[in-house]
Amino acid sequence: MNYLAHLHLASLAESSLLGNLLADFVRGNPAGEYNPAVVAGIMMHRRVDVLTDNLPQVRACRAYFSEEHRRVAPITLDVVWDHFLARHWQQLEPSLSLPGFTQQAQSQILPHLPLTPPRFQNLNGYIWPERWLERYAELPFIGNVLAGMASRRPRLAALAGSFADVERNYHQLETQFWQFYPQMMQQAKDKQL
């Protein structure tokens, strides 16, 4: 899961959106650094990551990637799941538009930015004004996201090439998304994540 799915599941679980978005920017035990609700959100994000990476449907998707890209497949898949969530948002969340959800998330997160790490503040300088969460629905934007990640982290250079595997196996990946994401939504609503 990437930013959109983590925020969506957090919202369904009534968990801290700030904590769920912040989690990748916090190392170690966050207790004592943030308030308990934010810590609980960070921990939920970590549980969702472990759960998602170990789902049989997600593990099976690694086979859709060429040998040279398989090492980065879990990262690519996290971004791809956000694409399918954004693309099918109205079907999954008919009562709230994606722009409306994005606005709600932004309003809950931005007031707390001064208390967060500089790298997280930097992310927030792009994610909201450039409408990343909404643009995840656009497949070319996913290619740009992967290329950007590859250029910022040389050891992840294979991310740029992994987009070809996504395009080649798009429908199979979409089918797998539908096999697990609605169930994760229900788990979030039931506070089981």
From Swiss-Prot:
<dbReference type="InterPro" id="IPR023491">
    <property type="entry name" value="ACP_phosphodiesterase_gpbac"/>
</dbReference>
<keyword id="KW-0276">Fatty acid metabolism</keyword>
<dbReference type="InterPro" id="IPR007431">
    <property type="entry name" value="ACP_PD"/>
</dbReference>
<comment type="function">
    <text>Converts holo-ACP to apo-ACP by hydrolytic cleavage of the phosphopantetheine prosthetic group from ACP.</text>
</comment>
<comment type="similarity">
    <text>Belongs to the AcpH family.</text>
</comment>
<dbReference type="Pfam" id="PF04336">
    <property type="entry name" value="ACP_PD"/>
</dbReference>
<keyword id="KW-0443">Lipid metabolism</keyword>
<keyword id="KW-0378">Hydrolase</keyword>
<keyword id="KW-0275">Fatty acid biosynthesis</keyword>
<dbReference type="GO" id="GO:0008770">
    <property type="term" value="F:[acyl-carrier-protein] phosphodiesterase activity"/>
</dbReference>
<dbReference type="GO" id="GO:0006633">
    <property type="term" value="P:fatty acid biosynthetic process"/>
</dbReference>
<keyword id="KW-0444">Lipid biosynthesis</keyword>
<protein>
    <recommendedName>
        <fullName>Acyl carrier protein phosphodiesterase</fullName>
        <ecNumber>3.1.4.14</ecNumber>
    </recommendedName>
</protein>
